[in-house]
């Protein structure tokens, strides 16, 4: 490599090292500042007092060298996007901190002669506030748990009766054996917030745990509800079965009554022949000649002789009861002539 090339390379290397040293020195001299996410923060300039000799105060982000606020005498104050506010004493307010606001901020102050009288860098870091810790315990194995749900890089500390017993980040589990009753304090904190909670734990020497008692009571209640539902179901089934039986009996009785009502018209003619006299026609009045149907009247002599042969024998009661099925048609019975008419008909023959 030629001498001019070596000289240029050495110059660039020296310049690069010196610039890195300046940046490192600037970050090392920066004032570390912590801000809470979603909150406002004021960047106060230490060891600075505003005077009439100050002409220019300028704030910028060191990451992109971008001006975000500026105060100049007899000129309007510049503030970017309403996210910043610059006070007359040089303090910069950053509103509603967000994650991307985490950066380094540099302030430069000049007097009326243009001389740089002060430069200061702030290294802003943002964290989420911690939530209040929660304490829970069980008396069966004398174990206590403390935990924090929210917060950036939380730090938990547990104290028993004022004595520090444990340190952790998110969850602390502690088993105590000194006594059955104790006072516990759990604190959670980070760079921007701190929360604490205190509980007095008292466990009985002998007896059931509260959770066991609740479980037994709950199980007993469920058992009682189940038994009540079972009794109600059985009672309802019995009522339904009884109602169904009653309906079946009623339907059966109605059917039997309907069948008996249908048989009655066929049984009435069969029972009437038991009283033959009631079924005969009423005797005709005296002097009336009875005639057989579809026959001409015969002479008196023949009428007396053939009249007894045309009377059919009356059916007996036993025959009526032995008959089964529908009743058979009966022959028409010829009415018996009155006694006076018979004597009148016989008198000419006797003469």
UniProtKB/Swiss-Prot annotation:
Disulfide bonds join 139-203, 146-186. The lineage of its organism: Eukaryota, Metazoa, Chordata, Craniata, Vertebrata. Residues 243-262 have a biased composition (Basic and acidic residues). Residues 61-75 are annotated as: CD58 binding region 1. Residues 236-351 are cytoplasmic. Its main location: membrane. Keywords: Cell adhesion, Cell membrane, Disulfide bond, Glycoprotein, Immunoglobulin domain, Membrane, Repeat, Signal, Transmembrane, Transmembrane helix. Interacts with CD48. Interacts with CD58 (LFA-3). Interacts with CD2AP. Interacts with PSTPIP1. Interacts with FCGR3A; this interaction modulates NK cell activation and cytotoxicity. This is T-cell surface antigen CD2. CD2 interacts with lymphocyte function-associated antigen CD58 (LFA-3) and CD48/BCM1 to mediate adhesion between T-cells and other cell types. CD2 is implicated in the triggering of T-cells, the cytoplasmic domain is implicated in the signaling function. It comes from Macaca fascicularis (Crab-eating macaque). Residues 129-209 form the Ig-like C2-type domain. One of its GO terms (molecular function) is signaling receptor binding. Residues 241-351 are annotated as: Disordered. One of its GO terms (biological process) is natural killer cell mediated cytotoxicity. Residues 1-24 form the signal peptide. Residues 25-209 are extracellular. The keyword Repeat applies. Glycans are attached at residues 89, 141, 150. GO terms for cellular component: cell surface; plasma membrane. It is found in: Cell membrane.
């Amino acid at each position: 490599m030629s001498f001019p090339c070596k000289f240029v390379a050495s110059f660039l290397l020296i310049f690069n090292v010196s610039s890195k040293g300046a940046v490192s020195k600037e970050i090392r001299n920066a004032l570390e500042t912590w801000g809470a996410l979603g909150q406002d923060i004021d960047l106060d300039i230490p060891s600075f007092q505003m005077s009439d000799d100050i002409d220019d105060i300028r704030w910028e982000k060191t990451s992109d060298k971008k001006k975000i606020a500026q105060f100049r005498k007899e000129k309007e104050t510049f503030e970017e996007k309403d996210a910043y506010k610059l006070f007359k004493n040089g303090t910069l307010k950053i509103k509603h901190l967000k994650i991307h606001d985490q950066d380094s901020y540099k302030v430069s102050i000049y007097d009326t002669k243009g001389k740089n009288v002060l430069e200061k860098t702030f290294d802003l870091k943002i964290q989420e506030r911690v939530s209040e810790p929660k304490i829970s315990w069980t008396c069966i194995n004398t174990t206590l748990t403390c935990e924090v749900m929210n917060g950036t890089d939380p730090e938990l500390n547990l104290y028993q009766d004022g004595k520090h017993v444990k340190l952790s980040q998110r969850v602390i589990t502690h088993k105590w054996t000194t006594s059955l009753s104790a006072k516990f304090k759990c604190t959670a904190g980070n760079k921007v917030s701190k929360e604490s909670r205190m509980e007095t734990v008292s466990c009985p020497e002998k007896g059931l745990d509260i959770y066991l008692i609740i479980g037994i009571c709950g199980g007993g209640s469920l058992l009682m509800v189940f038994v009540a539902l079972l009794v109600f179901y059985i009672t309802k089934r019995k009522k339904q079965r009884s109602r169904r039986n009653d309906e079946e009996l009623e339907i059966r009785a109605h059917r039997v009554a309907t069948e008996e009502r249908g048989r009655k018209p066929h049984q009435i003619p069969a029972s009437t022949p038991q009283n033959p006299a009631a079924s005969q026609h009423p005797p005709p009045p005296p002097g009336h000649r009875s005639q057989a149907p579809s026959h001409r009247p015969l002479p008196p002599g023949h009428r007396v002789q053939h009249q007894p042969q045309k009377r059919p024998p009356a059916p007996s009661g036993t025959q009526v009861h032995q008959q089964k099925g529908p009743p058979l048609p009966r022959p028409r019975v010829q009415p018996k002539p009155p006694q006076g008419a018979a004597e009148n008909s016989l008198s000419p023959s006797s003469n």
